[in-house]
């Protein structure tokens, strides 16, 4: 790259400016892009700046998106939230301040992203007020710069990161216009998308900086960031540098960027998931073409995105549940002079208007013969338009043509479609025509139908371009604010009818158009309008000339779109139920298709049930009129309802797990939580109709909820014990108590926490088995059993004693029914048999618990194992001769090894500390004592003759030894041990 001064002096000013944009200096910031192939297993680089902030929760597959979220987006949200809390403290309306404070704090606990708070329009005033603070702006700017710097340095192709950021290679400007493009490709050469960049030359307008200084904007650029990507699979990131007020790129050390993050979606295609840009982003006007700008380092920079494109991108981010939120501001009051764009900024994607006129006069081969419009648009009109009303030249030409007649508009469109072979250019023409029709109050519906038919039947278009063209028309219908929803519904029905009944489209293209129409229908303003639209589309499918099989396929596509939408479960259930009903009544859906759609309905119903039960439990816990007993009984009833519901076992388990988490994470005190979980265990164990297998599965789910809840370990242990206690309130099954341990194993709890929870479960199970065994014997009058080998024989003594009591009683009451001694003995024997059976059952329970599979050990056994392990670790430590080896041993075995219990690690550390202290004491007492078992040179060693008998011999040897302890190294080891102990104790205190 070269500087401007190095270009030949003959280059005129305009060419020099374009060359400067195309050929940045080495110091100049550049646009970049990154692409990671689908399901890439490339590991995230280890960098110190990101290692402490990027979590390992696995929620984000793409490392760049994850890094941006956790080092830029979320920290910026947190800083804004902190400033809002400061502002609330000074708010006069204390009720409102307290309400908003609670809203922020509660959402922080539930969802640390704060997306709901920032996405709530009611909070916008608070957010804008916070963004006015200069100190906050500095913090946000610092976060943006530091975060992007680390991301770019880490994920850069030049540093060996596969698919990392590399410069965008813009092609030369197209003809004499200020339009240039680039085809973005991955490392394999596959095309990802085509980016078009337009340099906009404006009559100067000014914007105000924060200090009131006016800055003149002479030039900026627009880039048509893609909304959908459907070519190559994977994740892509487009990072475009912001331009200075004069339209040139800044140096790298002052650069800021507008970055679009496209993350691999469920189908493998990149989806627009996040947008990262400086905060706050402002727009110079309220029109869709208003340019974005920011103040950075006291300077004004323009970003390569317009207000319309930004809003469209943010809607896509919201659709894919990204964490970015729209914090942009429309700053019309900052504009001191806003002129329309000059003539050269309106770059037709096809040709200039003069060329367009000649093309219209040329006969075409399309079905509609061309008719020259009565008048062509004037260039001067374009230059006089206010900026807020700027449109692209195609739209202006289309609107002018439509002012004559719809036939004139078709002539204009068809002439362009025939002349231009590029699909994107053809789509832009169709899109402009649709916009012109919808902006005209006359005959919208009829003209949209004509345009759609013309698009579907136009031989100048490829099948894929036809799909894209019709979808562009549908997107225009969706975004048009001046068309009532009822009229939009009729347009959707007509579009679907044209597509499905066309002989020029394959089934695949027909389905793509249908799916887009359904998407538009699902985005109408209210549920009534959406229902009318989907019902109309369904009826259109049924009435079409497709085969019954193809009709069924299309209805399934409608159902899939409804099922995948972001609507509430209740509305999805209504819409899907209507499609299914119509498909069954008209015999369009096959039995298999009916079953598939019914499965979707069942899943929605199950989700509704799950959410309803969770909401019900939340209401019970929050009800101030309920004491602990009432809450326990109410949640037991909810548990029973879940167990009795017809939903699948998987959903039942998820529901029970969610309910348990709600209880465990509630603000109730620990004992109240224990009582409620105990009640849930009792409700499951005592259920009358559930099979043992179903009960076991339910118990596992409850314990998984306990183990995964965000609460203190001690509370989890108490709730686990409570669950086992609840099981034992009914007749306990050993497999049911083992289910508690399996629930722990299935959870995502930490390994050391899992063992603690399983130990708690085993402890209470053993205690309850002992209690039940004693209780069972006491109930049969065997409070103090004699030491006999056979309990049955022992109990016969009781039977003999009974005879001496029964006979006198019967003699004294002859009116009673006589009972033979034989009958009495039979009855007594039956009772004793019951006692024996009870005893055998309890013994078997003990055997099951004490079997090798149960992992149940006595306290003495555990202590012995721990002592043995401590001795082994101390002995192994003694084999490490160097300080470095000893430090590595401490880190690997005592700090990082979570498979060892906390007690074993702490005992080992204590024992090693004692040894180090003893060695140090000996060294201080006898500093000159040496050992000669290791050949290490010591400062205290000395040369001695080989033989005392021949002192003249000069040949000597070095008697080498080592000090008993090197004081400096001893201090290092003691420090490492104490750090390890602190780390273990601190990790125990984490929630």
Curated annotation (Swiss-Prot):
Residues 743-789 have a biased composition (Basic and acidic residues). It holds the Pfam family 120_Rick_ant. Residues 1-10 have a biased composition (Acidic residues). One of its GO terms (cellular component) is cytoplasm. It is found in: Cytoplasm. Residues 1-63, 738-789 are annotated as: Disordered. Keywords: Cytoplasm. Residues 36-63 have a biased composition (Polar residues). NCBIfam families: Sca4_fam. This is Antigenic heat-stable 120 kDa protein. It comes from Rickettsia australis. The gene is sca4.
């Amino acid at each position: 790259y070269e500087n401007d001064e190095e270009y030949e002096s003959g280059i005129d000013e305009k060419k020099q400016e374009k060359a400067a944009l195309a050929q940045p200096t080495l110091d100049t910031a550049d646009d970049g892009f990154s692409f990671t192939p689908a399901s890439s297993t490339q590991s995230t680089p280890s960098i110190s700046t990101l290692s402490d902030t990027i979590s390992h929760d696995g929620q984000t597959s793409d490392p760049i998106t994850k890094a941006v979220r956790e080092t830029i987006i979320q920290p910026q949200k947190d800083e804004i939230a902190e400033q809002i809390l400061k502002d609330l403290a000074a708010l006069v309306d204390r009720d409102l301040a307290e309400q908003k404070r609670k809203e922020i704090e509660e959402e922080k606990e539930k969802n640390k992203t704060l997306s709901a708070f920032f996405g709530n329009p009611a909070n916008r005033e608070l957010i804008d007020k916070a963004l006015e603070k200069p100190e906050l702006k500095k913090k946000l700017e610092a976060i943006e710069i530091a975060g992007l710097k680390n991301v770019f340095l880490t994920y850069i192709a030049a540093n060996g990161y596969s698919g990392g950021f590399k410069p965008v290679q813009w092609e030369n400007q197209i003809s004499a216009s200020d339009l240039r493009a680039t085809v973005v490709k991955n490392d394999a050469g596959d095309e990802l998308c085509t980016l078009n960049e337009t340099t906009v030359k404006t009559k100067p307008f000014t914007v105000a900086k924060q200090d009131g200084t006016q800055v003149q904007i002479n030039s900026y650029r627009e880039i048509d960031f893609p909304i959908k990507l459907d070519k190559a699979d994977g994740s892509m990131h487009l990072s475009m540098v912001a331009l200075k007020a004069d339209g040139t790129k800044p140096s790298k050390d002052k650069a800021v960027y507008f970055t679009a993050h496209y993350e691999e979606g469920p189908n493998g295609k990149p989806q627009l998931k996040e947008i990262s840009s400086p905060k706050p982003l402002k727009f110079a006007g309220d029109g869709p073409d208003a340019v974005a700008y920011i103040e950075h380092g006291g300077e004004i920079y323009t970003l390569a995105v317009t207000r319309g494109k930004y809003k469209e991108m943010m809607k896509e981010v919201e659709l894919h549940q990204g964490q970015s939120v729209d914090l942009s501001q429309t700053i019309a009051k900052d504009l001191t002079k806003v002129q329309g764009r000059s003539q050269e900024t309106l770059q037709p994607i096809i040709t200039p208007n003069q060329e367009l006129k000649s093309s219209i006069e040329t006969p075409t081969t399309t079905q509609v013969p061309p008719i020259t419009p009565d008048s062509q648009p004037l260039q001067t009109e374009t230059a006089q338009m206010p900026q807020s009303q700027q449109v692209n030249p195609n739209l202006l030409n289309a609107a002018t043509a439509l002012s004559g007649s719809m036939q004139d508009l078709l002539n204009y469109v068809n002439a362009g479609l025939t002349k231009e072979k590029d699909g994107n250019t053809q789509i832009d023409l169709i899109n402009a025509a649709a916009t012109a029709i919808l902006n005209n109050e006359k005959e919208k519906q009829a003209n949209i139908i004509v345009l759609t038919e013309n698009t579907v039947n136009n031989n100048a278009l490829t099948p894929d371009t036809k799909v894209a063209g019709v979808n562009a028309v549908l997107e225009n219908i969706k975004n048009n604010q001046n068309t009532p929803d009822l009229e939009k519904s009729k347009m959707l029905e007509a579009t679907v009818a044209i597509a499905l009944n066309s002989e020029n489209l394959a089934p695949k293209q027909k389905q793509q158009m249908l799916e887009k129409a359904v998407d538009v229908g699902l985005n109408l303003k209210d549920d009534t309008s959406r229902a009318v639209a989907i019902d109309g589309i369904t009826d259109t499918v049924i009435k079409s000339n497709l085969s019954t099989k193809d009709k069924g396929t299309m209805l399934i596509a409608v159902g899939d779109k409804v099922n995948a939408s972001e609507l509430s479960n209740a509305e999805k259930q209504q819409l899907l139920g209507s499609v299914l009903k119509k498909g069954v009544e008209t015999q369009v859906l096959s039995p298999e298709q009916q079953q598939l759609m019914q499965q979707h309905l069942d899943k929605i119903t199950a989700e509704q049930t799950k959410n309803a039960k969770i909401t019900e439990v939340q209401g019970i816990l929050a009800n101030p009129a309920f004491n602990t007993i009432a809450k326990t009984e109410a949640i037991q009833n909810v548990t029973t309802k879940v167990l009795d519901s017809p939903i699948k076992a998987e959903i039942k388990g998820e529901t029970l797990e969610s309910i348990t988490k709600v209880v465990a994470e509630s603000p109730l005190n620990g004992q109240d939580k224990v009582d409620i979980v105990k009640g849930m265990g009792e409700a499951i164990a005592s259920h009358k109709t559930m099979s043992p297998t179903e009960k076991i599965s339910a118990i596992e789910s409850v314990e998984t909820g306990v183990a995964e809840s965000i609460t203190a370990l001690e509370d989890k242990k108490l709730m686990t014990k409570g669950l086992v206690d609840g099981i034992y309130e009914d007749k306990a099954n050993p497999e049911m108590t083992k289910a508690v341990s399996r629930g722990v194993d299935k959870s995502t709890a930490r390994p050391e926490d899992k063992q603690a929870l399983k130990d708690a479960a085993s402890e209470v199970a053993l205690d309850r088995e002992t209690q039940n065994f004693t209780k069972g014997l006491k109930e049969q009058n065997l409070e103090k059993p004699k030491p006999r080998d056979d309990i049955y024989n022992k109990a016969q003594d009781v039977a003999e004693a009974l005879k001496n009591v029964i006979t006198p009683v019967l003699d004294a009451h002859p009116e009673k029914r006589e009972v033979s001694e034989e009958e009495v003995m039979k009855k007594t024997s039956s009772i004793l048999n019951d006692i024996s059976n009870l005893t055998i059952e309890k013994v078997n329970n003990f055997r099951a618990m004490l079997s090798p599979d149960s992992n149940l050990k006595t306290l003495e056994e555990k202590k012995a194992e721990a002592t043995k392990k401590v001795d082994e670790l101390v002995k192994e430590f003694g084999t490490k001769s160097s300080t470095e080896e000893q430090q590595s041993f401490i880190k690997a075995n005592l700090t990082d090894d979570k498979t060892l219990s906390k007690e074993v690690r702490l005992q080992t550390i204590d024992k090693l500390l004692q040894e180090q202290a003893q060695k140090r004491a000996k060294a201080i007492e006898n500093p000159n004592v040496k050992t000669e078992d290791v050949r290490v040179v010591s400062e205290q060693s000395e040369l001695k003759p080989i033989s005392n008998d021949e002192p003249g011999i000069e040949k000597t040897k070095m008697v080498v030894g080592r000090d008993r302890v090197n004081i400096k190294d001893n201090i290092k080891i003691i420090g490492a041990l104490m750090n390890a102990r602190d780390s273990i104790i601190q990790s125990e205190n984490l929630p």
